[in-house]
Regions:
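Acidic, low-complexity/disordered tracts enriched in E/D and polar residues
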Residues: 1-50, 75, 101-102, 113, ...
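Radical SAM enzyme [4Fe-4S]-AdoMet core and its adjacent flexible, acidic
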Residues: 2, 14-15, 174-176, 250-252, ...
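Long, charge-rich, low-complexity alpha-helical segments
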Residues: 32-145
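Conserved alpha-helical substructure of the radical SAM core
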Residues: 76, 86, 105-245, 249-253
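Short, charged low-complexity linear segments at domain edges
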Residues: 121-144, 362-369, 406-433, 442-444
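Cys/His/Pro-rich metal-binding microdomains
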Residues: 156, 160-163, 381, 396, ...
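Flexible mid-to-C-terminal extensions adjoining Fe-S/redox cofactors in radical SAM and related proteins
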Residues: 402-508
Length: 508
């Protein structure tokens, strides 16, 4: 075997407790994660102790298994890692890496056109089996898998559906999104050190728009150096001409906000003329650099008749569409989003027949989309596998669930994680503790969000009006389908949507 190196495009985590070893290792060029356990995990743990682009002595890997494996056996294992891009023989030049990424980007475009995904394969946080397996294991040891950083509420778009506190939804309202005492880069450095020590796998950067944040590039560098997987949610406008710079930090994925292939509709939602063109220019740059991208598209009244065009648009850029019918109200208590932007009536039923959305209702889905829920389980992973940090440093369970467990200006994340009584109470809250949820026929169709309930009622334990409405709509649609009454009436989704007119932005 030639000299082996740890490539600059891998990251991961190693966890050992109670004599059990587990590891997760990413190939960030190909967007793949791999799970390891026992001795193979110990070897991966040894690999992760070396810096990126460092040569790895075989003897160090032999010693990581307490000499239980010979050098020949280690070489065989390393060859397997090399075959999937987790190690390299020799140090690759930047020109070779760039060419490989370009090839992968072209392949991703081709695959997005050819591959037809089945119902329910399109999740908001798309993960593979390796990530799910590792997440389930570390959850048992009370280790969060992902922490979201809301870096700032400042943004270069003015989206009508934005749930950031202080967001304005029309030209007559004044935005107060920028009036925040945001934590600085020193707070983030301490936070990242804490999260690395705990064993957190992934960081998500969001906002506002994260690239409006001062010191964003320094922060991304610190995340990369500490071996976190990195997801980013952005509109992309601040990344024109900077995609290649970001690509060198190997984000696991970048989610771009795209609301319609119709430029007029998209720009009316962002309230920034030319925003779709700019976002798509950035999408092309990401595709050319082989960075995995998603087109994130919430459905609302404005784009309800053209949202499906985002899926076709995504194919041109090798992107994965993330289309969702669920809207979230502002965390400051403004419920105008679900009250005025939420699709309803016959139009909602037609959209729920779209197999490209997670809340699809149809015979192809088990029980037409209804799911029996274990009342001894939590509704979601907010506050357990997922945590959130606001721009001011508040530690919350999710960016759409504004209950606070502490603030990083006062205490470290580790102190809050280990000692917050309110966090402990929340982590032991299960469906059976809720006042009404799980007691109605519609509840099997509910995509319950404790954060939405908190925004509406000041407590997550009361049923959300918006969630209940959606559950009722899905249940009633399922009953109609069982009786043979399909709102599509034998037509395609696109043909049925043509019978409706988009709600003008001025009406909101």
């Amino acid at each position: 075997m030639k000299e082996i190196f740890r490539p600059e495009w891998n990251c991961g985590r190693y966890h050992k407790e109670e004599s059990k070893s587990h590891a997760l290792l990413y190939n960030l060029i190909e967007g793949m994660a791999y799970f390891f356990e026992e001795e193979s995990a110990d070897i991966v743990g040894a690999i992760l102790r070396f810096p990126k682009n460092a040569q790895i002595p075989l003897q160090a890997l032999v010693e990581s298994t307490a000499n239980e494996f010979t050098e020949e056996e280690i070489v065989e294992f390393c060859n397997e890692l090399i075959s999937v891009g987790l190690l390299t023989e020799g140090l690759l030049t930047q020109s070779v890496i760039k060419e490989n990424r370009k090839i992968i980007g072209e392949l991703r475009k081709k695959q997005s056109i050819e591959i037809q995904k089945t119902v329910q394969e399109r999740l908001p946080f798309q993960q593979n089996d390796a990530e799910d397996t590792y997440m389930d294991i570390i959850e048992k040891y009370r280790i969060p898998f992902v922490v979201m950083f809301e870096l700032t509420y400042s943004c270069n778009e003015k989206c009508v559906h934005c749930f950031n506190p202080g967001a304005a939804r029309n030209e007559n309202e004044k935005s107060t999104r920028t009036e925040r005492e945001e934590i600085d880069i020193l707070h983030y450095e301490k936070l990242l050190n804490d999260l690395q020590q705990i064993g957190v796998v992934k960081i998500i950067l969001t906002g506002g728009d994260p690239f409006v944040k001062k010191d964003i590039w320094k922060l991304i560098e610190m995340i990369y150096e500490r071996d976190f997987a990195l997801d980013i949610y952005t509109n992309g406008l601040a990344l024109l001409g900077r995609v290649e710079k970001l690509a060198k930090f190997y984000p696991r994925s970048v989610g771009l906000s795209v609301y319609s292939a119709n430029e007029e509709i998209h720009d009316s939602i962002t309230r920034v003329k030319g925003s779709l063109k700019k976002t798509l220019l950035v999408a092309k740059d990401f595709a050319d650099n082989g960075v995995p991208i998603y087109f994130k598209c919430p459905i609302m009244n404005h784009n309800a008749t053209s949202y499906y065009t985002v899926s076709e648009l995504a194919k041109q850029y090798g992107a994965t569409p993330q289309i969702d019918i669920t809207l979230t109200d502002s965390v400051d208590g403004d419920t105008a989003i679900t009250e005025q932007l939420q699709v309803d009536g016959e139009l909602l039923e037609i959209i729920l027949r779209d197999p490209n959305i997670p809340l699809y209702v149809g015979k192809e889905a088990p029980n037409y989309g209804s799911q029996e829920k274990d009342k001894n389980q939590a509704f979601c992973g907010a506050g357990t596998v997922l945590m959130n940090i606001t721009p001011e440093g508040d530690v919350t369970p999710c960016n759409s669930f504004p209950t606070q467990f502490g603030n990083l200006k006062d205490k470290s994340f580790i102190e809050i994680w280990n000692n917050s009584k309110s966090l402990d109470v929340w982590q032991h809250t299960v469906i059976a503790d809720y006042e009404e949820c799980g007691t109605h026929e519609r509840c099997g169709f509910c995509n319950r969000c404790p954060g939405q309930s908190f925004i509406e009622h000041g407590t997550p334990l009361k049923a959300s009006t918006a969630n209940c409405y959606s559950a009722n709509a899905r249940m009633n649609l399922a009953k109609k389908l069982i009786k043979g009454n399909d709102p599509l009436n034998g037509n395609s989704l696109e043909d049925r949507l043509e019978n409706f007119k988009a709600v003008p932005i001025e009406k909101i």
